[in-house]
Amino acid sequence: MYLGIDLGTGSVKALLLGGDGKVVAEASRAYPVSSPVPGHAETAPAEWWAQTVEAVWACCAGRGSEVRGIGLSGQAHGLVVLGADQKPLRPAILWADQRATAEIDELLALDESVRLPLANPVAAGMAGLSLLWLRRNEPATYAAVRRVLSPKDWLRLAMTGEVATEPSDASMTLLYDIGKDGWARGLLDA
């Protein structure tokens, strides 16, 4: 059997498939998206974890030992900042968040040599812009940041203890140079 987990904006879904690809079981659990200020969209990563555990338990119910593989999908845009202990420093800033609109103008004003390798359309909820916003508006939190993850990559860390991403998710952060297949500091150094 194979387990699929999708970390959505307001809920997590778990799906158990048999070896023949047919659905054996499915479960979903909701979690809150808070908007402490108009235009902000945040969720505490601990909520994702708690509801993922519940959804997986409900879906696998006594069949966990039969699971041969796990696939993750979910929010690629968004920002989870971790401290030295690899724990979140604040609620995650989600893809729908609009607080970094001023940072969009700043990015678009950068020299093409910095902007073009990022190879993406720009939206306020992208991790690079949210990180710029954090640097300006929550400097103590920003100073404590040791790792930056997408929501889905944070869930992978919670499940496995491993920090990882893949190029398609990394490219959506505005912190990744697609042509060089590596992290770009241009936006944060500008």
PLM features: what roles do these ranges have?
Residues 1-90, 144:
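N-terminal glycine/serine-rich phosphate-binding loop of ATP-dependent small-molecule kinases
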Residues 57-190:
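Glycine-rich phosphate-binding/catalytic subdomain of phosphoryl-transfer
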